[in-house]
Amino acid sequence: MKKELLKILREKKPLVHHITNVVTVNDCANITLAIGALPVMAHALEEVEEMVSAADALVLNIGTLTNEQVEAMIKAGKAANRFKVPVILDPVGAGATKLRTQSSKKILEEVKISVIKGNSAEISILAGKGGKIRGVESQGGVDDIAEAAKDLANAYNVVVAMSGATDIITDGKRIAYVKNGHPMMGTITGTGCMLTSVVASFCGVCEDYFETTIEAFVAFGIAGERAAQSSNVKGPGSFKVTFFDEIYNLTPEIIEKDKKVEV
């Protein structure tokens, strides 16, 4: 991994355009700021093209989707492709309903995505391998989830990042396993959405999206580990606050020392 990615990110302060869900929008904005990037939340059909033209990365998160929002996502995504802005798709709950599955596939067909970030069930559904979803949380997936991730990466020429106890990141050829993180991260809503924002922040400063996605997952996981070990943490509420602080206080040296990656 490139050791100075976090330093570059904080020097450049990439603008990350989000079209995201109403549940976690504030957390996504704040985590983007904490890692060192600049968030903008703009979803109106009339302005998304103009906004993405000024951005360094685009997040498309279907957590609370509507048909109008999907239209705005596709419009923004096509503009991002024209302006060579990386597009990060978070297909929240793909497989839970037909609308979510079909919308995710429609975006993938009409927009050149740079990174797809999801859990094992979401990724396996989009790879055509089956999977089981309850609500928007993964309840399981295919036996060989790494192969499902590689198949999806090759199908759309995209980096696939699958979050789990061990995160799997692949571009269809290379594959990395990230083992940073802590179970406390699952006790608060929105960690997946926030991770997507961090991925986009890193992708906004380097075009090797495989490497930048690994760096984002490692940084995010390390912050979770450090927050969980803090004496200030008494439960999910204090964990969340401390987690933001740990994201903010990350350094390239901390990432290099604490990373747990197999490539």
Curated annotation (Swiss-Prot):
Keyword line: ATP-binding, Kinase, Magnesium, Metal-binding, Nucleotide-binding, Thiamine biosynthesis, Transferase
Top EC class of this enzyme: transferase
Superkingdom as given in the UniProt entry: Bacteria
Amino acids binding substrate: 41, 190
Pathway(s) per entry: Cofactor biosynthesis; thiamine diphosphate biosynthesis; 4-methyl-5-(2-phosphoethyl)-thiazole from 5-(2-hydroxyethyl)-4-methylthiazole: step 1/1
EC nos: 2.7.1.50
Gene Ontology molecular function, alphabetical: ATP binding; hydroxyethylthiazole kinase activity; magnesium ion binding
GO biological process: thiamine biosynthetic process; thiamine diphosphate biosynthetic process
Catalytic activity entry: 5-(2-hydroxyethyl)-4-methylthiazole + ATP = 4-methyl-5-(2-phosphooxyethyl)-thiazole + ADP + H(+)
Pfam families: HK
Role noted for this protein: Catalyzes the phosphorylation of the hydroxyl group of 4-methyl-5-beta-hydroxyethylthiazole (THZ).
Protein name: Hydroxyethylthiazole kinase
Gene: thiM
